[in-house]
Regions:
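Short aromatic-glycine-enriched beta-strand elements
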Residues: 48-59
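OB-fold/S1-family single-stranded nucleic acid-binding modules
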Residues: 102-132
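Short boundary/loop segments of OB/S1/cold-shock single-stranded nucleic-acid-binding domains
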Residues: 21-36
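Conserved hydrophobic positions within beta-strands
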Residues: 40-42
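Short nucleic-acid-contacting surface segments enriched for D/E, G, S/T with interspersed K/R
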Residues: 81-97
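Short, structured beta-strand/loop micro-motifs enriched in basic residues and often containing a Trp
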Residues: 73-81
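Bacterial N-terminal signal peptides
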Residues: 7-19
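Positively charged n-region of N-terminal signal peptides that target proteins for export
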Residues: 1-7
Length: 138
């Protein structure tokens, strides 16, 4: 009887973890064969779990039109380990972001840990960079 209950608990535990794995699937949403570096101005910061999202306007060099973009990063607690806080960036900051484009063609990207997020004026990285920027496998 104990063995059956243990087996059932194990199966239920594994089934419960399936949505978590699906949620953190970088390859389902982003294309690591499509890197991009964009420069723009921060418009909104969502410092929330499970992932921090930062939105920014990118100016088209050809026609001067602004396009809204967003990029996904790791969860707040991992970003804090890389020197980020919820005040590292503020609305209006000009930044340069390296990442991978969304597979669905939307103006979304996932931060590339090697390129990261920099202040455009100085080239200085925001925080210390590294794997905590996005805990997805890239």
């Amino acid at each position: 009887m104990k063995r059956s209950l243990l087996g059932l608990a194990l199966v239920l535990g594994l089934l419960a973890a399936v949505p978590l794995v699906a949620h953190h699937s970088f390859s389902a949403e982003f294309d690591n064969q499509k890197p991009v570096v964009l420069k723009g101005w921060v418009t909104k910061i969502d410092w929330t779990n499970p992932h921090v999202w930062i939105y920014f306007n990118v100016k088209d060099p050809k026609n001067g039109q602004m396009t809204k973009w967003g990029f996904e990063m790791g969860p707040p607690h991992l970003l804090q380990g890389s020197g980020w806080t919820n005040k590292s960036l503020k609305v209006g900051d000009e930044i340069e972001v390296g990442g991978f484009l969304a597979k669905n063609g939307s103006n979304r990207m996932s931060v590339n840990n090697q390129v990261g997020v920099k202040f455009a004026a100085t080239g200085q990285p925001v925080g210390r960079g590294g794997a905590a920027l996005n805990n997805a496998t890239q």
